[in-house]
Amino acid sequence: MNKKTISIILLIIFLITTILTLANVFLDDTNSQENQTGTLTVDNKTIHYEKAGKCLEVIDGNTIQVYGVGRVQLTQVGSIDNEPNFSQAKNFVSEKCLGKTVYLDIDDKQPKDKYDRTLAIVYTNDTDINKELLNSNLAKVSYFTPSEFKKGEV
């Protein structure tokens, strides 16, 4: 075999290994708590969540893709393209959620929006993501009605 053939074979092996590794990281749910209800303590408050899953993608500052759930809209949080803090909001959500298990307190009165995204307060092990975005002025309150959550309560 010549050097070019060997290089191509090594490149293919490398690409296959990389793809399998990434698939394992994002899709391995042997130790996850996906789609299980439960409780979580955040800021000394006991939180009830309806679903949990690994965050596979951050779409923007208030929308994520969760394994086993689909697209999730952070309820009461507005992060609009081309707004001054849009990039910072997306970066914050990426840092806190991407590749990690997130816990969803789904809005019981309106579980989906008009785009079929699940409406929820999103938690990590120690952070209320919705609340942190608002408290950090990275997003504005965007209220959906009806809602189990009171306006500004997040």
What annotation goes with each model-predicted range?
Residues 2-154:
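Small beta-barrel nucleic-acid-binding modules, primarily SNase/OB-fold domains
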